[in-house]
From Swiss-Prot:
Superkingdom: Eukaryota
E.C. number(s) listed in UniProt: 3.1.1.72
Function: Acetylxylan esterase involved in the hydrolysis of xylan, a major structural heterogeneous polysaccharide found in plant biomass representing the second most abundant polysaccharide in the biosphere, after cellulose. Degrades acetylated xylans by cleaving acetyl side groups from the hetero-xylan backbone. Displays the greatest hydrolytic activity toward alpha-naphthylacetate (C2), lower activity toward alpha-naphthylpropionate (C3) and no detectable activity toward acyl-chain substrates containing four or more carbon atoms.
Stated name of the protein: Acetylxylan esterase A
Keywords, ordered alphabetically: Carbohydrate metabolism, Cellulose degradation, Glycoprotein, Hydrolase, Polysaccharide degradation, Secreted, Serine esterase, Signal
Length: 307
């Protein structure tokens, strides 16, 4: 009887502890099919919140998409307002939704910390989310992607520059070049009117050097980039489309002034797609302002989930 009582007590404790781990330690076992917060994904120097969507039909060795919200946005808002969770159910990948810690919820794309590999800023926290998710779900490290809108697009370019080792591709919707919002006062979450208004204009080579300086010892492959922008954007002026495409053309060694092709009315009427090479496309949306539509099906093609 004593042995039986001991075993029952042990089993009850094990079940209780397991339930407590699931309840309190969402970082251990996030539920599939819903947006879940992960509270312990490792070092989080800038207090960015992590939310994750694990599909109900999770693939073996799944891919990962990091989907980064806009100013005033949240992980919940981007989860609801973007197509990535629905697409995850179709393709079996995991979606990470970071959430900015700042009032107004813009991202820090301005401090030296965030613009430096392992520098301790927002980019560092997001990179650690990727590392945790890859390990937790045995994800395919060659199928990790990043995308975002507005401030999230700025961070997309920053992530591609600071952690090129983590990402295979990125899609930026209405952003600016990596480093364009640099704060001379080293202020996180700073606004840069000169950049926003399209007045930060330089050469592809100079833009490339800014991106490459964010991880100066890196010599490996870099994520291919697709850049979307509205041609009547009055928040982040359309010149930022040109400058962002210049930056990645410089990084990949493409001649910015001699693209391989330009297609009209694609992916929809009055939009144009310019291709500089296999690693860089730009899509300029005619008549579209800052509120640019996410093209999830096009993203799936760029990320290699569909043909």
């Amino acid at each position: 009887m004593i042995l039986l009582s001991y075993l029952l007590t042990y089993l009850l404790c094990a079940l209780t502890c397991s339930a407590r781990a699931i309840h309190n330690g969402r970082s251990l076992i996030p539920r599939a099919g819903s947006l879940e917060q992960v509270t312990d994904f490792g070092d989080n120097p800038s207090n960015v919140k992590m939310y994750i969507y694990v599909p109900t039909n999770l693939a073996s060795n799944p891919g990962i998409i990091v989907a980064i919200h806009y100013c005033t946005g949240t992980a919940q808002a981007y989860y609801q307002g973007s197509p990535y969770a629905q697409l995850a159910e179709t393709h079996g990948f995991i979606v990470i939704y970071p959430e900015s810690p700042y009032e107004g919820t813009c991202w820090d794309v301005s401090s030296q910390a965030t613009l430096t590999h392992n520098g301790g800023g927002n980019s560092n926290s997001i990179a650690n989310m990727v590392t945790w998710t890859t390990k937790q779900y045995n994800a395919d490290s060659s199928k990790v992607f990043v995308t975002g809108t507005s401030s999230g697009a700025m961070m997309t370019n920053v992530m591609a520059a600071t952690y090129p080792n983590l990402f295979a591709a990125g899609v930026a919707y209405a952003g600016v070049p990596a480093g364009c919002f640099l704060s001379t006062a080293d202020q996180p979450d700073a606004w840069n009117s000169t950049c926003a208004q399209g007045q930060s204009i330089t050469t592809p080579e100079h833009w490339a050097s800014i991106a490459e300086a964010m991880y100066p010892d890196y010599s490996g492959s870099r994520p291919k980039m697709q850049i979307y922008h509205g041609n009547v954007d009055t928040t982040l002026y359309p010149q930022n489309y040109e400058e962002t495409c210049k930056q990645w053309a410089g990084v990949f060694g493409y001649n910015y002034d001699a693209p391989e092709s330009t297609e009209s009315n694609t992916p929809e009427a009055n939009w144009s797609r310019t291709t500089w090479g296999p690693n860089l496309q730009g899509i300029l949306a005619g008549g579209v302002g800052h509120n640019i539509q996410i093209h999830g099906d096009e993203d799936m093609k760029w990320f290699g989930f569909t043909n």
